[in-house]
């Protein structure tokens, strides 16, 4: 089983509770609006980190992250982006990526609202972990060792 910590919208602040959970995770996914490269440094010290940049992120952060990430974790394809739009309509960039890549899980941020929803039209589990800055919200995701197709 893979334990994944999903966070977004830290805006330059990383709570000690988030770092505690990050240490226990096999992977940390940050869905953008990192706010300060120090957040990436702190998370990278304690766990395997994958992150995308958000709309507030500096050139420095954008130089070491991408707008989108596609991860394969235990046979699950995970699409990570910052701004996705409202399911099942999405913005054009995300909708085109979903149609091309067929992810199982979409992790996104931006709204600061923790939300987990199943997009039945595109067969995608959509997860917005909320804002891990102030106040703190986050999501844990545990994937089985191997996906059975």
Where are the model-predicted features located?
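Acidic (E/D-rich), amphipathic helical modules within compact regulatory domains
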Residues: 52
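Active-site environment of divalent metal-dependent phosphoester hydrolases
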Residues: 12-16, 35-39, 56-62, 85-90, ...
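Proline-aspartate-enriched helix->loop->beta-strand connector
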Residues: 102-104
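Non-DNA-binding regulatory cores of transcription-related proteins
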Residues: 93, 97-100
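Conserved beta-strand scaffold positions in the cores of enzyme catalytic domains, especially
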Residues: 106, 126-128
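Conserved small/polar residues in nucleotide/adenosyl-binding loops
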Residues: 139-145
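N-terminal active-site segment of His-dependent metallophosphoesterases
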Residues: 1-49, 57-75, 80, 140
